[in-house]
Regions:
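Short, glycine/charged-rich beta-strand-loop motifs at protein surfaces that mediate ligand recognition
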Residues: 4, 12, 133-138, 145-149, ...
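Extracellular/periplasm-exposed beta-strand and loop segments of Gram-negative cell-envelope proteins
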Residues: 22-31, 38, 44-55, 93-97, ...
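Feature captures outer-membrane beta-barrel proteins of Gram-negative bacteria and organelles
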Residues: 101-112, 143-149, 181-182
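Gram-negative outer-membrane beta-barrel transporters
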Residues: 8-18, 34-132, 210-214
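Exposed loop/turn and edge beta-strand positions of beta-sandwich/beta-sheet ligand-binding modules
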Residues: 5, 58, 74, 102, ...
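C-terminal beta-signal and adjacent terminal beta-strands/loops
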Residues: 17-19, 24, 125-128, 150-215
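A generic beta-sheet turn/junction motif
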Residues: 2-4, 110-114, 151-155, 215
Length: 215
């Protein structure tokens, strides 16, 4: 970081090996599973059993900030975060379950008097390094705009904001499978079994306001 800490860059790489990582294996048909452990089971939910296996995770987190301009209407700055994780089951060679894909946040900040405002763009790449063993659902990449503003007095702060400003439809990379997509969600009866392959959608446009008082 710079001497006045107005500029900063932090890079954190990591590498981890786990000898008894709690993962999962397909249940064999003899135990009541939907299919034998060696069959793909594509397009279906699968029966699983916990298993301790060797795993490897590595990744990197990068964060930084820098001032952009100092004007009569306030101080403008730029802040950013980037994260990447890769996880693999060393016993099966499969991708680890529920690993966040490459993601980033870019924030344009503005401060003037009691005002503290942020325009944020939150992004995630497509999740296609999924666990085949669990038949994990893939998700598409997305970019969301969020707008936040606050005004502070010595003991009171007012917060206002809009999350997902443009009401973008997206699926949560770590949301799992949507189990509501069955007979109650479609005009065509599909029995009592939910449809596989529908990811849990993210929240639409959300507007909030709040007041914080310090005693």
């Amino acid at each position: 970081h710079s001497a006045d800490r107005s500029r900063a860059l932090k890079v954190t790489p990591y590498y981890t090996r786990v000898t008894d990582y709690v993962d999962a294996l397909r249940c064999p048909a003899s135990l009541g599973g939907a299919c034998a452990t060696q069959t793909p089971g594509g397009g279906k939910f699968v029966y699983l059993q916990f298993a301790n296996q060797a795993a490897r995770l590595y990744g990197i987190d990068v964060s930084g900030k820098a001032p952009l301009a100092s004007t009569r209407v306030g101080e403008f700055g730029l802040e950013g975060l980037v994260g990447y994780t890769n996880g693999r089951n060393l016993d099966t060679g499969d991708n680890l379950y529920n690993i966040m894909p490459l993601n980033a946040k870019l924030m344009l900040t503005h401060r003037h008097g009691g005002w503290d405002n942020v325009l944020e763009v939150a992004m995630a790449a497509a999740k296609d390094d999924v666990s085949a063993e669990r038949n994990e659902v893939e998700t598409a990449g997305y970019a969301l705009a969020n707008l936040r503003a606050s005004y502070s007095w010595p003991k009171v702060r007012i917060d206002l904001g809009v999350e997902n400003l443009f009401d973008t439809f997206y699926s949560l990379p770590l949301g799992g499978a949507y189990l509501g997509q069955g007979t109650t969600m479609t005009s065509t009866p599909v029995g009592s079994v939910p449809t596989w392959g529908t990811a849990v959608p993210g929240m639409g446009r959300s507007i909030y306001a709040g007041v914080r008082v310090t005693f």
